[in-house]
Structure formats: C-alpha cells, structure tokens
Amino acid sequence: PKHKYTFNNDMIYVTNSIDRPVEIKEVIDFVRSDDPRSKVKLADGTLADYIPAKRIALPVNKENALASGIVAEKDRDKMVDTVFINIKKNSLDKNQLMILDMLANFDWKRPIYMTQVYILQDFGLMDYLQFDGYAYRLVPILTPTQNPYEIGRIDADYAAPLLRDTFRYGNLKDPRVYADYFIQYNLSAAHARDAFARVAKELLRQNRVAEAVELLDLGLERMPTSQV
C-alpha cells in the first residue's frame, strides 16, 4: 500500500526468525500487514515492520519468461525453477523494499533492466544477470560472478546486434568533434568501449573469430582512442 512507502519503512529490519526460504509474496504480504503480530517492538516500545527471513524464494514462471523475451528459447533448459534471494544485511532501505515488492509482483511478464547493479549485492542477485551492452537484465539463469568487471552472462546473438546496429554513438568518431571532460568521464564511467570487448570475448569463446574481430574494430571506429 502507498502509505507503507509514504509514511513508513525508511528502514525495515531483517531478522532470521525463519531459517528456511520464504516465498517472496508471503514476505511482502507480511510487511504489508497491519497486524501487530507482524511487527517487531523497538527499544522505545514502538512497533516496526520487519522481514522475518533472510532467504527469500522467487519462483520462476518459465513460460512467462520465454513469452516476454526475458529468456531466449534456446536457453530454456538453462532456467532455474527458483531464484533464491539472500539478504546480507540486518536492515533494508525503502528503495530496496520497493525492489522486493516489484520482484514479488512482476511474474516474469516483462524484463527488468538496470544500469547500476550493485544495489543487488545486498540481495545476492548478482549471479542472475545478463549483460546486454549498456544495461543488465535480470534473468532466471545462474551465472556465478568470477570477475567484478565481468558481471552477468552474455547472449552474443542478442548483444552484438545491439552494439552494431541499435545503439547510436553520435559523431564521436569525427575528429572535428570536441570530446570534453564530461563526455570522456561519462563514457569511461559507463565502460562504453568495454562493452564491445566483453561481447567479442563471448564470440571468441564460441570460436566466432571473424565476428569478434569485426566487433572490436567497430568499437574502435565508433569510439576512437583519440577521443576517449
């Protein structure tokens, strides 16, 4: 309910009262409830909302995930039945509670994208991401993170056309265009050229050498080192 976000829950406590995974809808219903039994008493005697489990189960509606394009048909067999959320802190901020609320209700009917993924660290969801060039998609496919600079799986058949044909880079390749500090900073912060390298690396892993070389050359053409 709106009042839960407007007037309450700037911070919500998380306990491990239940030591098994609890389904995410049950968690949100528990927080949503105004029943005093769903509250924790603070030192000053006031009652506060809380989450009674640190392990939360997010069921995967596989047919919805396929129909909405979250997962490609070729990756059907890679999907897990349940995504397990592991809350690593003893409290969550309001924006983090909103993420749980969204996950509880989206039922895999539409993709969830983000550009900054580190908010997911507190949920243990970094291993359920797909890198699509300049954004990350939440997917029900487990891909353990080995390198903090290479978060998420890559579907090269999807990401390469995005980098090659969909994204626009303006006139950055024109030497007459002045790339000022802010342009260089933003492109560096977004690891803009690294996206080409990551997708090319996946193409190489699949032994698609010519495509990988072409993509790397394109990255240098669109964003030459003389500019960025």
Language model: regions and residue ranges:
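ER/secretory pathway lumenal C-terminal domains and tails of membrane proteins involved
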Residues: 1-228
